[in-house]
Amino acid sequence: MKRVYVNEEWCLACHLCEYNCAFANSGMKDMVKALKGKKIYPRIQVEVGTDENSRAISYAVSCRHCEEPLCVKSCITGALHLEDGVICSDKEKCVGCYTCILSCPYGCIMPSEEGNVIQKCELCTKNENGQPACVAGCPNRAIVFEDRGVPSAEEECAFDEEGGAE
């Protein structure tokens, strides 16, 4: 299955992935009308920090679409579910208890703009893009959408242990 992968060496922290994500999920056709002067609510977040040598490091974080997702298991209403390997949310079933937010080990689920339900990356499966908008909008190809095979449990946890993306 294709997944979003990040190369933190190439990330410029320009936040264009966030803007492209917010626009793709806005339901509007004009980016300026959709985003100008508004707080954006992207499903991908750029994290900025320093590495062990005190050098600046930045990378984008979004849902890892885990094979055995804790968020889906913890969802009390069944609003989170797997569709062809993609963790999707059903806003009609979500009651805003945020149990999934607390259970996601990557911090990739967040309250929606409305604040009463959650939002998360669904790999742009519910909008008009052929690939995730964050990938298409990254000027440096720091974000890619590739099939690298099924990650082992150790690879799934590598993000947490090493403090970086694959």
Locations of the language-model features?
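Non-ligating segments of multi-cofactor redox enzymes
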Residues: 1-166
